[in-house]
UniProtKB/Swiss-Prot annotation:
It comes from Pongo abelii. It holds the Pfam family DUF776. The keyword Phosphoprotein applies. The keyword Transcription regulation does not apply. Residues 65-83 have a biased composition (Basic residues). This is Oxidative stress-responsive serine-rich protein 1.
Length: 292
């Protein structure tokens, strides 16, 4: 049984190999193999000589290889061997989560401006309204309603603001902005639009700019400064180390160089090396051991 199977396999190999040989005339001779096969396969000639057919055999039968046909054609990517994480650069997070009312009005304005000319000033197309209303009344009501909030929300050009009196501008901005909305730059700058900052050459009086935090860095942990008791223990440790080195026999250099380091610092160090210097975990651990 085994020998028969082997013969069959060899025959299939040879037929596959011979199928690959394309004659110059364009006919493919599929020749029979061995004496065991009784039936001779007919020789197929190309029907039209003007277009000689060149048939590409499938990849599986190249060089007589009997590869199984690949069922899943798209191969999934191999799993990463190394256990180190895929690192991404640190992100910048914008702190002002509360969108101010003015910016939302601006967004609304940009949405209402649609490409067709009828709704250029925020006038929605007359299909939405009942046919009874005349277009004139539509114009009067709708533009009057929409243009007013837009005037308050759109930041003015300097030429425009010179024309309009500054007191009116400050009143409008003061009314539209509340204390909760002062978390973004636009609103704060609008609030200070009327009167220029008076602190030139003096200590700055504009408190609102000081409280504003714009970007926070989500990378390294912000380690709080050492508490006073911790600081004192650090000083004691360094003093005792110094006294020991002076009085007793000279210690090894590594012991003299060893500094008081707590676990948090070590963790930060290793994290820094892994995530910012892209050193894999094992190596960063070794470096930690060297530093401590």
């Amino acid at each position: 049984m085994k020998s028969e199977a082997k013969d069959g396999e060899e025959e299939s190999l040879q037929t596959a190999f011979k199928k690959l040989r394309v004659d110059a005339s364009g006919s493919i001779a599929s020749l029979s193999v061995g004496e065991g096969t009784g039936v001779r396969a007919p020789v197929r000639t190309a029907t039209d000589d003007t277009k000689p057919k060149t048939t590409c055999a499938s990849k599986d039968s190249w060089h007589g290889s009997t590869r199984k046909s690949s069922r899943g054609v798209v191969r999934t990517q191999r799993r990463r061997r190394s256990k180190s994480p895929v690192l991404h650069p640190p992100k910048f997070i914008h702190c002002s989560t509360i969108a101010s009312s003015s910016s939302s009005q601006l967004k609304h304005k940009s949405q209402t401006d649609s490409p067709d000319g009828s709704s250029g000033l925020g006038i929605s197309s007359p299909k939405e309204f009942s046919a009874g209303e005349s277009s004139a009344s539509l114009d009067a009501n709708h533009t009057g309603a929409v243009v007013e909030p837009l005037r308050t929300s759109v930041p003015r050009l300097p030429s425009e603001s010179k024309k309009e009196d500054s007191s009116d501008a400050t009143q409008v901005s003061q009314a539209s902005l509340k204390a909760s909305d002062l978390s973004d730059f636009q609103s704060v700058s609008k609030l200070n639009q009327g009167t220029p900052c008076t602190c030139i050459g003096k200590e700055c009086q504009c408190k609102r700019w000081h409280d504003m935090e714009v970007y926070s860095f989500s990378g390294l942990q912000s380690v709080p400064p050492l508490a006073p008791e911790r600081r004192s223990t650090l000083e004691d440790y360094s003093q005792s180390l110094h006294a020991r080195t002076l009085s007793g026999s000279p210690r090894s250099c590594s012991e003299q160089a060893r500094v008081f380091v707590d676990d948090v610092t070590i963790e930060d160090l290793s994290g820094y090396m892994e995530y910012y210097l892209y050193i894999p975990k094992k190596m960063s651990h070794m470096a930690e051991m060297m530093y401590t």
